[in-house]
Structures are given as structure tokens and as C-alpha cells.
Amino acid sequence: EVLSYWSGLGYYSRGRNLLKSAKILKQNFNSKMPNSSEDLQALPGIGRSTAGAILSLGFKTKAPILDGNAKRVLVRYFRINDPIDLTSTSKLLWKIAEDNLPEKECNIYTQAIMDVGALICTRTSPKCSECPLSKNCISFNENKQNLIPVKLPKKEKPVRKVYWLVLKNKEGEVLLENRNAKGVWQGLWSFPEFNEEEQRAKYTKQLPLSNPNSIENT
């Protein structure tokens, strides 16, 4: 039911995690959101940054976030030349995020750094002339804002070959199967999928087809 309402939005794992988390909250937290980072991160789909956002924006407590927008602001402001996707860089950014939290109105700071990253300190063509942080931004003052963040070279994406079986009856209905396995489109419906042609052939032999010889490879 959740996925049917979620249809078309993408990120279907988020829909499943919402339902899982709701059940945990009802069972273990009296249907209330916990107010500790540890308990929040125990919920499916919630990591350290999301937990920090919930604590800061929802409970107005002092907690750091480090989403993509906040990362970009911090690496440019402090001119961190190491690749942003390194574990060591992430650890450094978490320390910086914690050290620079204000003692009061942390919720306003959290919303502000996300907005600056999303609207001003953008991935390309940052609007430094509009940025309230540009005066002390090391990257801007050294004219390196377009060179940072540094990223590791992208790995070549693997090519995966699969076979889909498309079966249609006289009424125009097609055969679909639920994808229970982990991976792409988990829990959704698709044509029967096979990694090898032999698997497809074996599968079709078990089906009560009126004309099995009509199956063609395309």
C-alpha cells in the first residue's frame, strides 16, 4: 500500500523504510519519535546526518548534519583539498561540523547551511557574490571555488546483461513477477528476469503455454 502511493517518486527503499520505522516507533517508542541520535540511527534508512537534522530541526537541540549541501559549504569555506568522498575527509568534516555548531538556535543554523549549499554554494557556478560567507571563505578568497570539492575519479560502471520474458495472453494481459530479491526495484513488479538464456528456456518449459514455440529472442 505504501509503495502504491509512492509510485512514480523513485527511491522506493525510502517508502519501505518509512513503514518499517513506523512499526518500530509504535512498538518500542509509544508511537513517538526518539530524541537521541543513537535511537534515531537504529531506525531503517536513518543515518547520522538525518538523525542530526531531526534532532536540530525537530527537537531544536544541538546536533550536526553533513548532507551533500553542508559538505560542499564546509569544504569550500575551509578549502579542504582532499577528495570529498574519502573516509578521512568525511571524518574531518564531521569534526568541523561539530566544532562550528552554535550554542543557541542550532535549528536556524542547520536550515541555513542547507539552504546556502542548495541555493548559493551550488555544485557548479556557485553564486559567491550573494553568499553571506564569502568574506571568510578561503576557497573564494583564493579563487578556487570552482576547483573544490575535489572528487575521486569515477569508477567505470559495470555492464549487466539480463533477459526479460514478455508473455501476453489473448486478453492482452502480461505476466509480471514481484521482485522480492535485494537490488534494483526491490518489492516492485516486472517481467520475469534471467541472467542466462538457459534459465529463461527452463522457466518457460514449466509454464502452461498454448504455443511455446512462439517465444522469440529480441
Predicted feature descriptions by range:
Residues 118-218:
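Intrinsically disordered, low-complexity, charged terminal extensions of DNA damage-control enzymes
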Residues 1-127, 133-142, 209-212:
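Catalytic cores of DNA base-excision repair glycosylases
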